Amino acid sequence: MLKIRLARGGAKKRPYYSIVVADSHSPRDGRFIEKVGTYNPLLKKDDAARVTLKVESIQAWLAKGAQPTDRVARFLAAQGLVQWTHGNNPEKAKPGKKAQERDAERTQRDADRVAAEAQAKEDAKAAAAEAAEAAAAAAAEAAAAPAPEPEVVAEEAPVEAAAEEAPAAEAAAEEAPASEETTEG
């Protein structure tokens, strides 16, 4: 299959292209059949020497079935030699297979995290409801149980009586070990 394509020449960072007719299997800058034009991208876009074409030779090769590449087809369309339409490939903008897998994993992780957070909120609500229910049950039990009647007796009298009993108990405790020692010996 014959192609009309660009063959790069020029130095590093200074490109210069030849427009050539070549077999599609030959290397980009390798063997070609005929040179049919030049392209110098360093010149301004409105410069006439930016693209030069041998129109008769190109028409002959197009008649023989040579297919221009996209870039060369643009140059030929500017000269009116071929009809060029902007390619529409919506698949080109889509992410690749691995990127789609990473996105799927990321969305799955996000969904799992959101589900875990929702579950934690539900568990917290359930625990709060149980605690509230337990508190209500405890309050109901406390209300149901008869409350001890507060004594109207003066508080000071029992405190003094308890104070008098405490020294007496201490004295008795001191005497008890002494009596035990004598019985053992």
UniProtKB/Swiss-Prot annotation:
GO terms for cellular component: cytoplasm; small ribosomal subunit. It comes from Caulobacter sp. (strain K31). Residues 89-125 have a biased composition (Basic and acidic residues). Belongs to the bacterial ribosomal protein bS16 family. InterPro entries: Ribosomal_bS16 (IPR000307), Ribosomal_bS16_CS (IPR020592), Ribosomal_bS16_dom_sf (IPR023803). Residues 83-185 are annotated as: Disordered. It holds the Pfam family Ribosomal_S16. Keywords: Ribonucleoprotein, Ribosomal protein. This is Small ribosomal subunit protein bS16. NCBIfam families: S16. One of its GO terms (biological process) is translation. Gene3D superfamilies: 3.30.1320.10. SUPFAM superfamilies: Ribosomal protein S16 (SSF54565). Residues 126-146, 159-176 have a biased composition (Low complexity). GO terms for molecular function: structural constituent of ribosome.
